Amino acid sequence: MADTSVQKLAAEVGKSVERLIEQFSEAGLKKGQADTVSETEKQQLLDYLKKQHGADKAPTKMTLQRKTVSTLSVPAGGGQSKDVKVEVRKKRTFVKRDDSELVDQAELEAKAKAEADAKAAAEAKQKADAEAQAKAAAEAKAKAEANKAKEKAPQAPAPKPKAELKAETPEAAAARAEAERIKATQEAVLTKKQKEEAAQAAEEAKKLAEVNSKRWAEEERLRLEAEKNGDHHVTTSKVARAAEDSSDMDDEKRGRRARNKPTNKKRGGKDARDGREKHMRNRSTAPQSMAHGFNKPVAAVSRDVRIGETVSVAELAHLMAVKATEIIKQMMKMGSMVTINQILDQETAQMVAEEMGHKVVLLRENELEEQVLGDRDDNVKLETRAPVVTIMGHVDHGKTSLLDYIRRAKVAAGEAGGITQHIGAYHVETDNGMITFLDTPGHAAFTSMRARGAKATDIVILVVAADDGVMPQTIEAIQHAKAGNVPLIVAVNKMDKPDADPERVKSELSQHGVMSDDWGGDNMFVHLSAKTGEGVDELLEGILLQSEVLELKAVREGMAAGVVIESQLDKGRGPVATVLVQSGTLRQGDIVLCGLMYGKIRAMKDENGNAITEAGPSIPVEILGLSGVPSAGDEATVVRDERKAREVALYRQGKFRDVKLARQQKSKLENMFANMEEGEVQELNIVLKADVQGSLEAICDSLTGLSTAEVKVNIIARGVGALTETDATLAAASNAIMVGFNVRADAQARKTIEAESVDLRYYSIIYNLIDEVRAAMTGMLAPEFKQQIIGLAEVRDVFKSPKIGAIAGCMVTEGIVKRSAPIRVLRDNVVIYEGELESLRRFKDDATEVRNGMECGIGVKNYNDVRVGDQIEVFETIEVARTL
């Protein structure tokens, strides 16, 4: 290869001339910009560069990473959508080429280019020579044929041309031939170059197809699977690639615009906003290749909606695949106002779903509870058990006194005020067998407790005082007995009194469906006296006779089951529950499930406080060891596993909480508009603590029943046990009164009560508690005012006074006229002015009041149109005490 200049070599290797001269200088060769470089000098420079950088040295690399994040909105079911973040990561590696490689590459490229040019020139010359020879031969042949034809053709006189054509000179012919040859050579080179480019493009396309064939096949397989399975997430890769390509194009466009656009000064205000808006309009958005995930059905879709015990509006909408607003509209049509987070009970949710055309499947969420309660080793052998007898009747009709005589113990003295406020459960051994008695309170407030007693009993004894007859609680007891389908025995008490009238009792009871067996009815009547014991033996015989007719039997061996009669929180013993065993045998150490509570029985005591280890059917017993205070009336069941008992108790607590919340929300929504219309209602806040659960429920029901449209009793906290410091703090913060029923406040609570001046009241009789709360509510009523006329004066004459104006000379015809009282001026019995007196005189002296039949002068303040014949009415406003 011929020598080349330094400048040309620098252009070939892609370096600046100064850098190349510097490298020549480092290699020991002094070169200038116009000097030539021989092959030997090139080789010497290449050897130096290889030695300097190392022949096997790895090239320097630089890796750049770029991460772009985009967000896709995909359907999530139920008419909702969710956002999915797509993150695209790109990695690019740049390799720094070595100088020796650049020199080798430049040398090879130059050599290849020279060889290609030489080869192309030789081929072009050869082709041009061949074409010239062929053209010359063709011209010679054509000329010979033309001469031959000319000789054969007859001579004809040729027309005389208008202008003689100039003959072509040899120099012009040679120039034209040379131009045609050069043109043909260029066309040949261009054609060859196009063929080479086409072949190279085909080769590259073939290589690209080989590289991408596997990836295309995999994408096609994934697409077919996605169409088959309906999975929309597979298309995320397509959208991500489209977003990436779009982002690359945006970056390239922004860079090109930034390079081409001249720099302007910073703009502000409207120009800047216009520019930003235009930029946002011109921005290209990523192509959305994902198809819509939901097509609106042309017909109504009926789904199987699985509904549990409780469900919120949002969850129900998701189950039915509709928007929550549709359910809210449907419930508004049904007359209920709900919110999206409101809890619906199973019945309401079922009604809504069926109204909207769906099939409802009610879930049994208490399968675990049924499994635990069904796993019992009950003995199928039934044995006769003692009857459970409930004594009912009106207050002070002698129920507890009757039971006291039967038990030979003074129980009535232990109850405050001589009335029963707890359910007393006792079993009595008689000569004819054992009988279990439940003594229920007779006060109206204990309706729920009495209803509980009727559910747990076999026979009801209705005690009616012979001197008092049928009373409201007597009628209520009859209703409870009939509702429980329990046989009724009437005990006509207080027969020792002189004014006793048993026939009147029979007549009054017959009006309520209780007919004596003497009158052809089904109910046994026993005349007795709890004070003298007259007729008590006949009553016991009647009870045992009735129990034989009922054939009362129960399983004696096996796991026990019963009902909670009463419960309380004892300060030393913890939660204590009185349980009436109905079947099986309850033993110390058993795992008991009582309503929302559970526990292992640590101790058992009978009604007299004696420790026992087991209790059979129809035996009342106190048990200790529960996790909390159960509600009276809950079923008590012995289970095998304490862990499963705990799970069932927690499930019941959650279910109770959900149902309670649903009930509260329903009450709030129903009363919302009523409260708006009625205005502000006075509230009497109460913190209530009682000794036992039954008394607590009865007091709460009674106090809640006292609420009126103007004053509402709000029991902000209730519980069983002593009043604690927490209760006192809550009462102080809520401006509430603290009420203790048979309980007292501890030392810390008393300190807080004194410091915060909280109103604390103790009660042992429910009458007094209700009466004082009613009095407190009466004091909270809005005052009522009434106008009372105290005097009337008739105008007989009118005088003019320069200081006051018109003075009415009057005669007091009724009552008394007071100086400080407001007045009305009446004309023809029509009120024309209402105001107050400015002066009241008797003769020339000022007077504070003028009585009936006396004359006086009256000056009306700010009113001068007093005429003869008018009447001046004097009145005063008094406050009238209101009652509930």
UniProtKB/Swiss-Prot annotation:
Q: G5: where is this region?
A: 529-531
Composition bias (Basic and acidic residues) maps to 110-153, 193-234
Q: Where is this region: G1?
A: 393-400
Per the record, its GO cellular-component terms are: cytosol
Q: Where is this region: G2?
A: 418-422
The UniProt annotation puts the region (G4) at 493-496
Alphabetic keyword roster: Cytoplasm, GTP-binding, Initiation factor, Nucleotide-binding, Protein biosynthesis
Q: Which positions in this protein are listed as binding GTP?
A: 393-400, 439-443, 493-496
Which family, according to UniProt?
A: Belongs to the TRAFAC class translation factor GTPase superfamily. Classic translation factor GTPase family. IF-2 subfamily.
NCBIfam families named in the record: IF-2, small_GTP
* Annotated function: One of the essential components for the initiation of protein synthesis. Protects formylmethionyl-tRNA from spontaneous hydrolysis and promotes its binding to the 30S ribosomal subunits. Also involved in the hydrolysis of GTP during the formation of the 70S ribosomal complex.
The entry's protein name is Translation initiation factor IF-2
